[in-house]
């Protein structure tokens, strides 16, 4: 199958935090025509996220941390409630999420279940996020969490029902976290009886 595009130009715009390129390309349309488009693509690498849950207690582990993009887009405090997550760097998705779980939440989860992967903002960002879930209990507690280096992460253990209420009333606004909580509902992890 031939490529649907011909890249005419690729220009590096920034590589300070992640990589931002400008692409000029000719897109072959279904009707046979060709249209030239110009897009900026932000390459931040792929990532992984996990919902830690305890079925017996009816709880989930979430984190709260400052996110500058939310602050500049109307979130007064900049703080965001979210599931543990991180960039893959040079790790497999499974290795990454186990490491992130220990660093951010303090739980050393061994058995992680891969749920799915998804492009989170495909209109301008390359990132594909790998979604996982794992059961936790106090025997898996390795440390107090909170992140590493310049991270300042608060670890929260919440009743699943409260997390769902927070999602429904807008206190949880993070897309990956909403997807994981909805997945828990679909799978019936906290269904009564």
Swiss-Prot record:
Its cofactor is Mg(2+). Mg(2+) 2 binds at residues 100, 104, 151. One of its GO terms (biological process) is nucleoside phosphate metabolic process. GO terms for molecular function: hydrolase activity, acting on acid anhydrides, in phosphorus-containing anhydrides; metal ion binding. GDP-alpha-D-mannose binds at residues 38-40, 67, 85-87, 104, 127, 150-151, 176. PROSITE patterns: NUDIX. Residues 43-180 form the Nudix hydrolase domain. Mg(2+) 1 binds at residues 85, 104. It holds the Pfam family NUDIX. A motif (Nudix box) lies at residues 86-106. It catalyses: GDP-alpha-D-mannose + H2O = alpha-D-mannose 1-phosphate + GMP + 2 H(+). Keywords: Hydrolase, Magnesium, Metal-binding. Its EC number is 3.6.1.-. The keyword Hydrolase applies. It is an enzyme of class 3 (hydrolase). One of its GO terms (cellular component) is cytosol. The keyword Zinc does not apply. In the dimer, the N-terminal domains are swapped between the two monomers, such that residues of both chains contribute to the active site. Nucleoside diphosphate sugar hydrolase that hydrolyzes GDP-mannose as its preferred substrate, yielding GMP and mannose-1-phosphate. Homodimer. Belongs to the Nudix hydrolase family. NudK subfamily. This is GDP-mannose pyrophosphatase. The gene is nudK.
């Amino acid at each position: 199958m031939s490529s649907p595009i011909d890249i005419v130009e690729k220009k590096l715009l920034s590589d300070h935090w992640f990589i931002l390129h400008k692409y000029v390309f000719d897109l072959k349309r279904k009707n046979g025509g060709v249209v030239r488009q110009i897009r900026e693509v932000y390459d931040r690498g792929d990532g992984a996220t996990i919902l830690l849950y305890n079925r017996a207690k009816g709880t989930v582990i979430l984190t709260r941390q400052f996110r500058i993009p939310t602050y500049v887009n109307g979130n007064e405090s900049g703080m965001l409630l979210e599931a543990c997550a991180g960039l893959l760097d040079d790790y497999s998705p499974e290795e990454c999420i186990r490491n992130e779980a220990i660093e951010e939440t303090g739980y050393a989860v061994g058995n992680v279940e891969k749920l799915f992967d998804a492009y989170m903002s495909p209109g301008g960002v390359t990132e594909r996020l790998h979604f996982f879930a794992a059961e936790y209990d106090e025997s898996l507690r390795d440390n107090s969490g909170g992140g590493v280096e310049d991270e300042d992460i608060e670890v929260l253990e919440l009743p699943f029902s409260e997390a769902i209420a927070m999602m429904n009333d807008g206190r949880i606004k993070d897309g990956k976290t909403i997807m994981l909580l909805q997945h828990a509902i679909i799978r019936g992890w906290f269904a009564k009886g």
